[in-house]
Design a protein with these regions (language model features):
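Residue-level recognition of the N-termini of beta-strands and the immediately preceding loop/turn
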Residues: 9-11, 57-59, 115
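Short HxH-centered metal-ligating active-site micro-motif
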Residues: 36, 41-70
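Zinc-dependent deaminase
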Residues: 1-6, 67, 73-125
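Short beta->alpha transition motifs characteristic of CBS
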Residues: 22-29, 88
């Protein structure tokens, strides 16, 4: 995801489809004063533009941190099939746990699509 100076909210995300990076970005919430510009939503937006479609079926989203519900929903609407993240929400300095439902539970409850959610800690990655 390239080099970037550390900032308090330094989140990154990469979208991969057919073994090719089609979108990547960082969190822009504070610099743009826009609460929707999380790394995941920004990377999905770039991936859709680069891929030429709003449908990213078969893509994987890799994130530095566990996606929030907004980002999970955006991934679902974009057709992303797999989400992999390194740092769980409960491990973050700036926790944003808005619900007691895990992403894995939420993914299992979806009736209109299947999304695999994997936590691969940094020590393992």
């Amino acid at each position: 995801m390239g080099n970037r100076k550390a900032k308090p909210y330094n989140f990154g995300a990469v979208i991969v489809k057919n073994d090719e990076i089609i979108g990547e970005d960082f969190n822009h919430v504070h610099e743009e004063q826009d609460p929707t510009l999380h790394a995941e939503t920004s990377a999905i937006k770039k991936a859709c533009k680069n891929y030429g479609s709003h449908n990213l079926d078969g893509a994987t989203m890799y994130g530095s941190h566990e996606p929030c519900l907004m980002c999970f929903s955006c991934a679902a609407w974009a057709g992303i099939d797999r989400i992999v993240y390194a740092v769980a929400a409960s491990e973050q300095k700036f926790s944003y746990e808005f619900t007691d439902v895990s992403l894995q539970d939420l993914a299992r409850k979806l009736t209109w699509r299947t999304i695999s959610v994997e936590h691969i800690p940094l020590e393992v990655a």
